Amino acid sequence: MASDEVMPRIIAIDYGKKRTGLAVTDELQIVPGALDTVETHRLFEYLEKYIQSESVERIIIGEPRQSNGMPSENMARVREFENRWRKAHPEIPIEGYDERFTSVLAHRTMIDAGLHKKARQDKALVDKVSATIILQDYLSHR
């Protein structure tokens, strides 16, 4: 493959009860970046619009787990979303990825970036950064 060949993107989801953070790779699937934060009840529609304009290879969705590895209370909602996506879009696989500690890492990243306390309290920003961390971790382990 030529180094300048455009590849389909990979999307990462930090699925929340109210809000969901999204991140996406660049066209070469090398660099992840924050995409958006959407209200969770609008996520499916948002992704359907996105795939109409961008080629997407797969979706990585954070699996909410407790520190001991057991599923958290949000896992059922994540599984429900995964199943709905698979039925509607079998051509774009969705796979779970351990998201333990991504919120902590997101806050640490924001501190290291020099963001002020007010910016770090922006939950939508934390969600996008968390999704970016999920995607970066996925890319580094594939």
State where each predicted segment sits.
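Phosphate- and other anionic-substrate recognition elements at nucleic-acid/protein interfaces
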Residues: 2-13, 17-142
